[in-house]
């Protein structure tokens, strides 16, 4: 089986359907003896340019190992699903399991925010004890 990176963008009005779509696609892959190495739901993001007069879309990234028949089926599903604005399936040489730069940046921002909140809480406690 080959390794693939799949990115698809969903219409922003259909964002509530994304978990169900992910579940269906992962079930199709695992049902055909495939493996999912990475699954990231990036959420609703700004598009670089308008697509069908839309400025935002819900992004999903999947790195999978699957037979060609399943990938063909997924591409057909993407093509005929009106909620999917764009999709891209790329073959990769090996499985990608580490977090994408999008998720890494989000985690770093969260860590910095938590560190800042802890520092301000410590400063407030230190100020209270001095008085």
Curated annotation (Swiss-Prot):
Residues 120-131 have a biased composition (Acidic residues). Residues 104-116 have a biased composition (Basic and acidic residues). It comes from Escherichia coli O1:K1 / APEC. One of its GO terms (biological process) is translation. Belongs to the bacterial ribosomal protein bS6 family. It comes from the Bacteria. Binds together with bS18 to 16S ribosomal RNA. HAMAP family: Ribosomal_bS6. GO terms for molecular function: small ribosomal subunit rRNA binding; structural constituent of ribosome. Keywords: Acetylation, Ribonucleoprotein, Ribosomal protein, RNA-binding, rRNA-binding. The modification N6-acetyllysine is found at residue 93. This is Small ribosomal subunit protein bS6. One of its GO terms (cellular component) is cytosolic small ribosomal subunit. SUPFAM superfamilies: Ribosomal protein S6. Residues 98-131 are annotated as: Disordered. The gene is rpsF.
């Amino acid at each position: 089986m080959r390794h693939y990176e799949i990115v698809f963008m969903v219409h922003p009005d259909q964002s509530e359907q994304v978990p169900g779509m992910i579940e269906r696609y992962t079930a199709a892959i695992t049902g055909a003896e495939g493996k999912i190495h990475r699954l990231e739901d990036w959420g609703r993001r700004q598009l670089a340019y308008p697509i069908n007069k839309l400025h935002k879309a819900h992004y999903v990234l999947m790195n999978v190992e699957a037979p060609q028949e399943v990938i063909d089926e997924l591409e057909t599903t993407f093509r005929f699903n009106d909620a999917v604005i764009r999709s891209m399936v790329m073959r990769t040489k090996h499985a990608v399991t580490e977090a994408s730069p999008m998720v890494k940046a989000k985690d770093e921002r969260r860590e910095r925010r938590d560190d800042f909140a802890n520092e301000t809480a410590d400063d407030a406690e230190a100020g209270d004890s001095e008085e």
